[in-house]
């Protein structure tokens, strides 16, 4: 008996038809071309690995796609690419002198509630810059993702940048217990500043300290907020993180991308391996971040190679959806030329096809003998702009459309 699921797709995955596939391939090709001009080299990691390579405190186990191999080992599909990239460098490239500039194009898997822009399987394009720990390295990856988003046609995007050192410095300064710090982190991540104010009011030493802390983490805008931030922060880790942001912003102005940058001193991302810079990119056409990244100086050490690193990932599915909303549905690729033939002229027609394809043209060959009128109708149906017709004498002519 045939299952009721036969012929259907599981929730959270989808088929990609020619028009979208063509647009997606274009996004991948633009990404590859761009990052290679910045000196980045492509690597490929397995789609699944041992669960212990991918698991961490911040990645909830129920979000993984897991299975047992025939030896009983627990395996999982990769939920992101940062940990696989860290493992790869720490185990396979540890003898290479840094900096290492690497990029990837990969599908990743998260077991979550499907909706537009949030699938269980989706494609990422990303880079990792491993070795340098400077603000200049962070500026390189942020400027690179900004340049890529510009090349996709998303002119209205903004990248919010912050530094988790501000949060950790404030937690230390306030002496917050671990569970309270986690509660504060979740409230900040949800931009629930009412809850943030409630937590600070209950645990800060004085109302003034609570107000100064809240004022600091609510700061958002251009470089003008940094002077205000320095005035609110006490000397220590939080002030150091603000200074790091100042240096980073200066680097981004050197790249000429500052109009796409917003400073957000309360920005946190969901993954605990970030140690400094964090950032997320947004566009008006998409309610979720289209890209994100940051600095993770401790992750490679978990695989035996202490090395600072920074990087980003672009969610190509979300970029595709945003482009469709802004520009309309993508168009299917069409051939440049239809070559049609009659009687015994197929050999001549195929020689012509070969020469045209050698010139880089997209050429479709008629599958049957066509009279000229049928060839022209077929060309219009395909969207071809030219028709070359071979008669029974083997002579060719270009038919007008």
UniProtKB/Swiss-Prot annotation:
Location relative to the cell: Cytoplasm
A GO biological-process term: L-histidine biosynthetic process
One function term, GO molecular function aspect: catalytic activity, acting on a protein
InterPro entries hit by this protein: aa-tRNA-synth_II, aa-tRNA-synth_II/BPL/LPL, HisRS-like_core, HisRS/HisZ, HisZ
SUPFAM superfamilies: Class II aaRS and biotin synthetases
Disulfide-linked positions: none
Pathway in which the depicted protein is active: Amino-acid biosynthesis; L-histidine biosynthesis; L-histidine from 5-phospho-alpha-D-ribose 1-diphosphate: step 1/9
Keywords in alphabetical order: Amino-acid biosynthesis, Cytoplasm, Histidine biosynthesis
UniProt key word Cytoplasm: yes
Segment forming the signal sequence: none
Principal cellular location given in the protein's record: cytoplasm
Pfam families, sorted: tRNA-synt_His
GO cellular component, one term: cytoplasm
Remarks, miscellaneous: This function is generally fulfilled by the C-terminal part of HisG, which is missing in some bacteria such as this one.
Protein family membership: Belongs to the class-II aminoacyl-tRNA synthetase family. HisZ subfamily.
UniProt cross-references to HAMAP family, sorted A to Z: HisZ (MF_00125)
Role according to the record: Required for the first step of histidine biosynthesis. May allow the feedback regulation of ATP phosphoribosyltransferase activity by histidine.
Assembly and interaction partners: Heteromultimer composed of HisG and HisZ subunits.
Name by which UniProt lists this protein: ATP phosphoribosyltransferase regulatory subunit
UniProt organism field: Desulforamulus reducens (strain ATCC BAA-1160 / DSM 100696 / MI-1) (Desulfotomaculum reducens)
